[in-house]
Amino acid sequence: MKRIAFLSAACLLMLGTACQRGPVAPVATQSKVVEDGGTGPYKVLMLEDPSLEAHTIFAPQNLAPFGKKNPLPVLVWGNGACTNSPWEHYKFLNEIASHGFLVIATGYIPMEEKPYRGPMSTSAQQIESIDWAIAQNADKNSPYYGRIDVENIAAAGMSCGGLQTLDNATDPRLKTIMICNSGLFINPGTAVPNMPMPSKDRLQEITVPVIYILGGPEDIAYENGMDDFHRLVKVPAFAANYPVGHGGTYRQEHGGEFTVPALGWLQWQLKGDKEAAKLFQGADCGLVNREGWTVEKNDLID
């Protein structure tokens, strides 16, 4: 009896994850397996959780492998056009999640691959995603209890979603930010109404590493994004360009080529992966040797 009691106490001390047997599934009101769950080591489910309205979650189908020794870092995502659904980006986000990340996208789950026509999303929805992840990690009744790495959270977004990310960039819970096909407007008068519009001064308030992933000079956000990058002199900053224009490669199989720097950056910044760091560090970094990519970085990257 004493031995049983001791083992039970040990399980509690290890956040209840190490002693559980069998798979642990996330809660979902509706869900979909995208591209066989991704190519990473953890098959993913795209789902809607009843406790987080107007958000889409990409989570491992089985949460059992995650716990104190292998927690899930978090990526919160804002969509292009500030659309309230990740319908253009779900393949890209699904692939990232399959490599051991909890991805929470702003907006309603895209059960069908068709444009979302509802109202725009808001910057606050990214903050809701962060709040939810932290609360789930602390909730003993949640399947995510003790499985989320709340010390390693990234915010990212594409186009208008990138502006939402920059709007939230000073949140102290963020470890890094990733800006895709976006940048603060050099001329705010050219912006679409209702877009978040922080001034360029916001860049000097950022205290975490930043990566810009852009579509080359044909990308309508190229000048704004590169201008941002050149202003970031106090934090590690990296700019990667792939010549596909503003739309990126998100809708291609497994998110296409944009997944390479995005995943590598998150593995480096949120998991401390030294192999992933080689994509970005050094004069002969891995990404510069990958066909099609051009890169710039400041001295703080190396």
Which sequence ranges carry the predicted segments?
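C-terminal motif of bacterial Sec signal peptides marking the signal peptidase cleavage site
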Residues: 15-18
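N-terminal cap/lid segment of alpha/beta-hydrolase-fold proteins
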Residues: 23-70
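Gly/Ser-rich "nucleophile elbow"/oxyanion-hole loop immediately N-terminal to the catalytic nucleophile
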Residues: 64-71, 115-163
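Short beta-strand element of the alpha/beta-hydrolase
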Residues: 69-80
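Short amphipathic alpha-helix adjacent to the substrate-entry channel of hydrolases
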Residues: 87-106
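Hydrolases whose catalytic domains are alpha/beta-hydrolase-1, hotdog thioesterase
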Residues: 164-168
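The feature captures the conserved acid-bearing segment of alpha/beta-hydrolase catalytic domains
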Residues: 175-252
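Alpha/beta-hydrolase-fold serine-hydrolase catalytic core, especially in secreted/extracellular enzymes
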Residues: 235, 244-247, 252-302
